[in-house]
């Protein structure tokens, strides 16, 4: 943190550069369990970056921090505003977290599952992966029928990827695709599994099939264009004879700009 503070002392530092340094300092405060200081710094960065993407990125961080702290209604209100962000990634992340919070707040049940899940998310952010996994396991055991089942599997997959346990991560993602494939995290899980197969597990044919699945099952996903490009690349490297079914499917997946798949 001392290095970051020295960076802030550099003369004629641009506001956005200063904002990036302050954001890292705030992240460290979250990591070190000092949420109120982090909240204050995030607010300063937002105030100084109202007209650029950094402002929205930090608004998302601030909303997530409120979620970590259990202020679910407040966090959801901030996230709902961010769903209109010009950054597709920020808007998508805000939408997913807002829907997850809303789906659980609207239930006529205890808030304990959501509180536990938020705790696990904070531990994961703090790189306390083993502790996060313990909380997720406890949540699944204590509340086996809560609507967070697919979220729990997705968080476990992300933890195992960070732990370099890619095969185990793939199993969690496969469970989401098989059982919750058309729910909120369906496209996230499908794309993440395709990336694992493509770059970590060296299963190129399986990756190619999953990228194609993304185009047919989730045409409106933020991952669609990237999946199309990677499918084309793998198709060129690993060509196969099209089945009649695949030929019909690809008619609906042509890129409007190029009129080709």
Language-model features: where?
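Acidic, polar-rich low-complexity tracts and alpha-helical solenoid repeat scaffolds
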Residues: 1-261
């Amino acid at each position: 943190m001392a290095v970051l503070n020295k960076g802030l002392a550099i003369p004629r530092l641009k506001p956005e550069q200063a904002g990036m340094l302050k954001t890292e300092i705030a992240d460290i405060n979250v990591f070190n369990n000092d949420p109120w200081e982090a909240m204050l710094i995030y607010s300063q960065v937002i105030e100084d970056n109202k007209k650029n993407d950094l402002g929205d990125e930090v608004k998302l961080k601030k909303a997530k921090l409120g979620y970590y702290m259990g202020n679910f209604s407040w966090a959801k209100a901030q996230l709902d505003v961010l769903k209109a962000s010009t950054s597709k990634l920020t808007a998508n992340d805000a939408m997913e977290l807002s829907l997850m919070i809303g789906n659980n707040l609207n239930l006529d049940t205890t808030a304990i599952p959501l509180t536990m899940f938020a705790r696990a998310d904070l531990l994961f952010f703090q790189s306390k992966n083993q502790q996060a996994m313990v909380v997720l396991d406890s949540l699944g055991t204590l509340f086996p029928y809560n609507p967070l089942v697919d979220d729990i599997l997705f968080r476990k997959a992300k933890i195992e990827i960070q732990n370099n346990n890619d095969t185990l991560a793939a199993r969690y993602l496969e469970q989401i695709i098989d059982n919750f494939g058309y729910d909120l995290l369906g496209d996230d899980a499908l794309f993440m599994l395709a990336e694992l197969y493509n770059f970590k597990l060296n299963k190129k044919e399986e990756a190619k099939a999953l990228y194609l699945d993304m185009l047919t099952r989730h045409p409106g996903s933020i991952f669609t264009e990237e999946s199309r490009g990677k499918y084309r690349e793998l198709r060129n490297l690993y060509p196969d004879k099209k089945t009649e079914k695949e030929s019909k499917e690809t008619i609906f997946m042509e890129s409007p700009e190029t009129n080709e798949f």
